[in-house]
Amino acid sequence: MPVKFGKVLIPQPRSKFVKIRCPDCGNEQVTFSHAAMVVRCLVCGRVLAQPTGGKAKFAGHIVKILE
């Protein structure tokens, strides 16, 4: 009988890095999906991510989710 290989039970993290575009100036910036501090745009200073206790609430447009 051949040996059957099951699923490898290695937990994967749910948090990722995301690239956000600022709605005011168009600057693209990389931040953490579960940010614990307020993330501001480096060019104009607008708040891009607000911490909520879990995932951050994003004010800008999410351009790409980085792996």
Curated annotation (Swiss-Prot):
One of its GO terms (molecular function) is zinc ion binding. Keywords: Metal-binding, Ribonucleoprotein, Ribosomal protein, Zinc, Zinc-finger. Zn(2+) binds at C22, C25, C41, C44. GO terms for cellular component: ribonucleoprotein complex; ribosome. The keyword Transmembrane does not apply. One of its GO terms (biological process) is translation. Its cofactor is Zn(2+). A zinc finger (C4-type) spans 22-44. It holds the Pfam family Ribosomal_S27e. Binds 1 zinc ion per subunit. Part of the 30S ribosomal subunit. Belongs to the eukaryotic ribosomal protein eS27 family. This is Small ribosomal subunit protein eS27. It comes from Pyrobaculum arsenaticum (strain DSM 13514 / JCM 11321 / PZ6). The gene is rps27e.
